[in-house]
Amino acid sequence: MRRFVLSLAVASIVFVPVLHAQHAPSAQKTTQTCPPSTTIQELTKALDDAVSGPGNKDRTCLRNLLLPDARLTPIRKTPDGSFAPHALTVDDWIKAVAQRGETAFYERQIKVTAENYGHFAHLWSTYEIRDTPDGPATVTGINSVQAVNDGTRWRVLSILWEPDTTAGPIPERYKP
C-alpha cells in the first residue's frame, strides 16, 4: 500500500503539471506583440499603438515599453480651481482606462521633438486624441516623455501630459 501511495504521489507531481500546462489557455493568444523600440521614432509609434484602442484591451506591450517604476502623470484641474499633477503607476493607468470597457480612444503624436544625450532622451510631443482611428481630433495636448536606452531599446521612465482643455491652445511652435 505504501508503494502504491508513493507511486501515486510521484505520478501526481510529474504528470499533473504537464497535463495542466497542455490544457491551460495559451498566453500567446492574449498577449499583444510589441514592436521594437530601438529608435525614438519606433518608441513613439509603439506607445501610440499601446495606449490606443478599447479601454479593456491587452496592455502587455505598454508594460514592455515602460520601465517597471514608470509614472504616467496628467495635469488636472483640482476642485479649488488650481492645477496639479496626478501621478499614476502603470497599473493605476491601466485600471483607470479599463473602466472605459469597449469604448476606445486613439492617440497620435503629430509632432515630436527629441533631445538625446548618452542613454536618455526627452521627447516633447504634441498629441491628438480621436474616438476612431481616422476621426476628427477631440483633444490635443502636449506630452513630456523621459526615455532611457538600455543599450538595445528605448523604454519610458515617465510621461507628463496636459490637454489643451486645461492649458489653452497649443502654441504654433508645437504644431506640425
Question: What does each model-found stretch correspond to?
Answer:
Residues 55-82:
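N-terminal, post-signal-peptide region of Sec/Tat-exported proteins
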